[in-house]
Amino acid sequence: MKRAKKFKDYFEDIKPVTDEELEELLNEPPRRRNRGNFKKAKKEFYRDF
């Protein structure tokens, strides 16, 4: 029952996306600058092991 409560609390905050918002998200170009950040994070992660 505890899990169901957490699940309910989690999904109460989620709002459905309107068609206009979805269209805006689909029309935005993907961001390329985050790709370098991922590589850096991966390097740091493997350095720890």
From Swiss-Prot:
Descriptive protein name: Uncharacterized protein AF_1303
Domain of life: Archaea
